[in-house]
């Protein structure tokens, strides 16, 4: 994916060194946008192998409204383990904000369901927005992620914090605003995850997939990922794979792992890099 490699190269060449919460240090730029035409293939990196199983299960977990990592662990996904309480709780993170945003009067808003209804009812709406950024439940930075979760706050503030859908010419597009992007490890997952969400939403709304637009705020490369980034930049991207969804599924919340099939995915070898916690 040239778009992603261009981002990696841009930050490698122009990033400003900054200290960060984890103490690792980053090279960062502020404000960067990529666009992927989903009719041209599924945007999953070919210059290193991605763990698609984790991407799919995490998205299904978000959409279920769950905030405990039990489902992920049962399906061999460990990407959230480092922030959860011993009981597996993460506090009111993505799933709760997407599906059960708490209101001041004691009610809840299912943002995903409301947006689905609005796409079908009024596809020209400019309000097809889902937000995970809820200041009332942001974590206290002076205590650990698991302590925040135990106190009813988010273990981590949402990195991919707001997305918007757009319908034109029978196609559904999605734009994600990501306030903070770990370019080497996190961003490739985010691209594939939101591209997949767009395919799913398009199918259940009887639309064709359009573009996935990815807007990054603080786009950063951790200082202990520089060698890995250079390794990836030396590789040549191959053709994008194809993602096929079970056409019988017409309910967004009825998708299961077995409803997704990726074909023609022939990536280069995985590149290992440490996670900054």
Swiss-Prot record:
It is found in: Cytoplasm. Pfam families: Thymidylat_synt. Its EC number is 2.1.1.45. DUMP binds at residues 21, 126-127, 179-182, 190, 220-222. The active site is at residue 159. Transmembrane segments: none annotated. The keyword Cytoplasm applies. InterPro entries: Thymidate_synth/dCMP_Mease (IPR045097), Thymidate_synth/dCMP_Mease_dom (IPR023451), Thymidate_synth/dCMP_Mease_sf (IPR036926), Thymidylate_synthase (IPR000398). Keywords: Cytoplasm, Methyltransferase, Nucleotide biosynthesis, Transferase. One of its GO terms (biological process) is methylation. Pathway: Pyrimidine metabolism; dTTP biosynthesis. GO terms for cellular component: cytosol. Its main location: cytoplasm. (6R)-5,10-methylene-5,6,7,8-tetrahydrofolate binds at residues 51, 182, 276. Homodimer. Catalyzes the reductive methylation of 2'-deoxyuridine-5'-monophosphate (dUMP) to 2'-deoxythymidine-5'-monophosphate (dTMP) while utilizing 5,10-methylenetetrahydrofolate (mTHF) as the methyl donor and reductant in the reaction, yielding dihydrofolate (DHF) as a by-product. This enzymatic reaction provides an intracellular de novo source of dTMP, an essential precursor for DNA biosynthesis. Belongs to the thymidylate synthase family. Bacterial-type ThyA subfamily. This is Thymidylate synthase. The gene is thyA.
